[in-house]
């Protein structure tokens, strides 16, 4: 069984011009699933009905208390989010699906995609488990990625990523996450 420590190398190896080990029909199944997930995400963004925010989600758990209160109690709706920002969010979903597709084709075990979890009554959807390790997929600019690469996210986490994945880890009763 593959280990998450080799995930990046194994994904790069898919594109090295060496034949991959997975049968082409199996690859097609994974690609079909990927296509279906893209369809779900794209349609959700194109046909989403205007609604107001009004509930706390685990994805917001690391934000400052005051910002959380405002987000939950304001009358702001999804209509207030610019089209360019909505496309940026969609791009993140597409990249997440691509990462999980590549992980699967590279022979890693991908499970529990978008599994709903609850911590202290607050719901959320984790991204996935890869090789039995909780994984939260993040897309970032090269500037923002420095925090991950230089391992300084613990000191500077403006989006609350650590709190978010910690909540998912608590819901799954696991100690290891990536």
Residue ranges and their predicted role:
Residues 1-134, 141-152:
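Metal-dependent nuclease catalytic cores that hydrolyze phosphodiester bonds in DNA/RNA
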């Amino acid at each position: 069984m593959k280990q998450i420590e080799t995930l990046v190398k194994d994904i790069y190896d898919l594109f090295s011009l060496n034949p991959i080990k997975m049968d082409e029909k199996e690859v097609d199944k994974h690609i079909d699933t990927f296509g279906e997930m893209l369809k779900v995400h794209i349609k959700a963004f194109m046909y989403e009905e205007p609604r107001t925010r009004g509930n706390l989600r685990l994805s917001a758990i690391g934000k400052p208390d005051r910002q959380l209160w405002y987000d939950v109690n304001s009358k702001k709706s999804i209509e207030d989010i610019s089209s360019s920002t909505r496309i940026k969010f969609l791009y993140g979903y597409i990249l997440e699906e691509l990462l999980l597709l590549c992980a699967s084709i590279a022979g890693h075990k991908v499970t529990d995609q978008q599994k709903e979890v609850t911590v202290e009554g607050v719901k959320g959807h984790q991204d996935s488990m890869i090789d039995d390790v909780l994984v939260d997929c993040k897309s970032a600019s090269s500037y923002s990625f420095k925090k991950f690469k230089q391992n300084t996210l613990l000191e500077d986490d403006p989006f609350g990523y650590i709190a978010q994945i910690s909540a998912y880890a608590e819901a799954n009763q696991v100690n290891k996450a990536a």
